[in-house]
Structures are given as C-alpha cells and as structure tokens.
C-alpha cells in the first residue's frame, strides 16, 4: 500500500490476488466411452491404436462448433450462471473433440471454488447430452492434452490491475515495479 501511495493512489485500502482458470476438456460420445474400459476406469486410453486423426485437419480451434456441443455449452452456461460463475469465452481447442471454458476472473479463493464447480457441472451436463467430459490432462496418446491455464494477477480494491502495463512511462513504471517484486 505504501508503494501505491507513492504513485498517488491514496484511495487504495487493500491489494488482492485474482485468478481465472481456463479449463480445457474433451467431450466423448458416451456410447463410445462405455466401450473403452481404460477410459471408464482411468479417464485415459491405455491400449489400442493411436487416433487416426490428429491436429493436422481444420476442424479444431477456429472450426465451427457442432450444434450438439453448442447446446451443451449453452446449458453449461445456464447452470454456471445460476451458481454465480460467468464464462467469458468458450471455444474449440487444438485436438479433435477438445474445448475450453474461461470464466471471468475473481479473487483467487473464489476462483478456485468456481473451478471446482465448473469441473463438476461440466461432467453432469455432458452426461445429460449423451457425452462424457474428460478432464484428464492427457487422455489420448498422440494428441494435445488438456491444460489449465491460470490467469493470475494482483488487483486493488479500486479495480486497478497491478500487472497491467501502463499507457504512459509513469504508469508503466508502476507495472514494472510490481512485476519485478513478484
């Protein structure tokens, strides 16, 4: 707080840690999932041939989302909104059948709780749509895995992000100071 006061921010009363965990996941047809004991028991493939299709096609990341997955995402959003978890973005990811949900950031404690809710609600919602949501970090050999990117920062109670670069040299000095201190 003393450093912020040196930069002229007299109104700041506290600094908090904020976070937003981008959750990647795979959606698999339930009937196909049920035929794979390794997926059922371990949430990943342990035997069998590698995927015949990798990331070389154009049906990932910027590809269109199928209507079925769109309905899943809509229902997921509705359920999460009712719990106070707001998704900022949802899109396809690099591997076939892989997607990502990025919630709006919150204080780190709340964001951690939100991520637990997101994972639980994803699984339940997928089942209602005849799919299984796989959250294992590497469910399929030879394909990108599912990561969890954590967008972490420090913010003030007045809404200032201390890890956002400034627009002027003076404002950038504050950013560089906090970045170096971390």
Where are these regions (language model features)?
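Glycine-rich, acidic/polar active-site loops that bind/position phosphate-bearing ligands
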Residues: 1-135, 140-182
